[in-house]
C-alpha cells in the first residue's frame, strides 16, 4: 500500500509538509471532498470489509468510498504512515429517536497529538454532521466551522461531541417535512473515551451493522460527499445538496427525486463512484438525517 497512491486518490499535493495542524487539516479536507461516506456495498450484495488491504483496494484503487470504520481506518493509516502521533478511538453514536447513545461501539475516530496538543479527526460521519477541521480536545469550547459550531464536553472521562446548527431553507415545498431533514438545532452526535482501540475491536459491530434489520445501514442506502460550499447526499433515490450559510445563519437544502437510471449517472458524476454490481436503492424506516 502506497501513501502516494492515497495522496493521488484524495488530490493532495504532498510536499512532505511539516507534521503540523495545517497539514492535518489539509489532508482531512482533501479526503472528505474526494472519498464519499457511503454504504453501497451492502445494497449491491457485497460486504463492508475491515482489513486495511481490502479498504485500500476499495477506496484507493477502485475509487469508492466507505463508512466510518473504513474511511477513518484509512485516514488513521495515512496519518500514522506520515509520522503523526495517532491513537484509534471508539465512539457511541447518539440515537435521536431513542434519546440515548448506542450501547455498542459503532464509530471509529482518530486522536492526533501535535506538539503535546490533542485533536480529534474524523472523516467518517458525513452529511451535514461532518467536521471540516480537526477539533481541539478541549472541554466546553465552541469551535465554529463551515458546517456548524462543534462542541466537545468531557464528563467523568467520557467525551461528548455536539453540534449547534443553523436554520435551514427548503425551496421545494414537497420535501419540507422530509424524514431526512434534521429537526434539532442543537444536536448530540456521539460520545467516546480516550481508551486506545485496535481495528479488531470493531469486527463484531462491523458484521452487525451490515446484517441486522435493526441497523440503519441495512435500512437505507446512502452516499455523501463534501464540497467546498456544502454537501451532496443520496439516500435511496433522493438526492440532496446542502449549501452552508447561503444566507446569514441559514443553510439552503435542495431535494430531487431520481429515477433508477439517474441514480447511476449521479453516483458517477457527483460522487465519482462507479459500481461493479447493481445497486438496489433503499429508503427504509430507520432514522437517518442529512
UniProtKB/Swiss-Prot annotation:
Gene this chain is encoded by? Nat2
Gene Ontology CC annotations of this record: cytoplasm
Q: Which residues bind CoA?
A: 103-104, 208
| EC code(s) of this entry | 2.3.1.5, 2.3.1.118
Protein's name according to its UniProt entry: Arylamine N-acetyltransferase 2
Q: What class of enzyme is it?
A: transferase
> Function, please?
Catalyzes the N- or O-acetylation of various arylamine and heterocyclic amine substrates, and participates in the detoxification of a plethora of hydrazine and arylamine drugs.
A Gene Ontology molecular function term of the record: arylamine N-acetyltransferase activity
Q: Record's family? A: Belongs to the arylamine N-acetyltransferase family.
Quickly give the catalysed reaction. an arylamine + acetyl-CoA = an N-acetylarylamine + CoA; an N-hydroxyarylamine + acetyl-CoA = an N-acetoxyarylamine + CoA
Give the keywords, sorted.
Answer: Acyltransferase, Cytoplasm, Transferase
Amino acid at each position: 500500500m502506497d501513501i502516494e497512491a492515497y495522496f493521488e486518490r484524495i488530490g493532495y499535493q504532498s510536499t512532505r509538509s511539516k507534521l503540523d495542524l495545517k497539514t492535518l487539516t489539509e489532508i482531512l479536507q482533501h479526503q472528505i471532498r474526494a472519498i464519499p461516506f457511503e454504504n453501497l456495498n451492502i445494497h449491491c450484495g457485497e460486504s463492508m470489509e475491515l482489513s486495511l488491504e481490502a479498504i485500500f483496494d476499495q477506496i484507493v484503487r477502485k475509487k469508492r468510498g466507505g463508512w466510518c470504520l473504513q474511511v477513518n481506518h484509512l485516514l488513521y493509516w495515512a496519518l500514522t504512515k506520515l509520522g503523526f502521533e495517532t491513537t484509534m478511538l471508539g465512539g457511541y453514536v447518539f440515537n435521536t429517536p431513542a434519546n440515548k447513545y448506542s450501547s455498542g461501539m459503532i464509530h471509529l475516530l482518530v486522536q492526533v497529538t501535535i506538539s503535546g496538543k490533542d485533536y480529534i479527526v474524523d472523516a467518517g460521519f458525513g452529511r451535514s454532521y461532518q467536521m471540516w477541521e480537526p477539533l481541539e480536545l478541549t472541554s466546553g469550547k465552541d469551535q465554529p466551522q463551515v458546517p456548524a459550531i462543534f462542541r466537545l464536553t468531557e464528563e467523568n472521562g467520557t467525551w461528548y461531541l455536539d453540534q449547534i446548527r443553523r436554520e435551514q431553507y427548503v425551496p421545494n415545498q414537497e420535501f419540507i417535512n422530509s424524514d431526512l431533514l434534521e429537526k434539532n438545532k442543537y444536536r448530540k452526535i456521539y460520545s467516546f473515551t480516550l481508551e486506545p482501540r485496535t481495528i479488531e475491536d470493531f469486527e463484531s459491530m462491523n458484521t452487525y451493522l451490515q446484517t441486522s434489520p435493526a441497523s440503519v445501514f441495512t435500512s437505507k442506502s446512502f452516499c455523501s460527499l463534501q464540497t467546498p460550499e456544502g454537501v451532496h447526499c443520496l439516500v435511496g433515490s433522493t438526492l440532496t445538496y446542502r449549501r452552508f450559510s447561503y444566507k446569514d445563519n441559514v443553510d439552503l437544502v435542495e431535494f430531487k427525486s431520481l429515477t433508477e437510471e439517474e441514480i447511476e449517472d449521479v453516483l458517477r458524476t457527483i460522487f465519482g463512484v462507479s459500481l461493479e454490481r447493481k445497486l438496489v436503492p433503499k429508503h427504509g424506516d430507520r432514522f437517518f438525517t442529512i
